[in-house]
Amino acid sequence: HKSAKVNSIRTRNLIEQCDIAVVRFGEKYKQWNAAFDAGYASALGKPVVTLHDEALTHALKEVDGAAAAVAQTPEQVVRILGYAINGKL
């Protein structure tokens, strides 16, 4: 558990420094950690982009509701970030 605590310090620090938080949910990702990170970023006023399969849409409806954008593929995230940063799709 010590490494998890150290990692949480790093994660919190990176979220505090970010301009936009991209939070990925999926089979290989711990849902509760991702949900916590999304909530923390949102509480700090950071725009959140969620990334997850369509199968998780209902389960993540509250998280997606608080997100600035929702994506189902990494390519969609790239397009969202490109628009947010450069104003181009």
Segments predicted by a language model, with ranges:
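Conserved catalytic or regulatory cores that recognize and/or transform ribose-phosphate-containing ligands
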Residues: 1-89
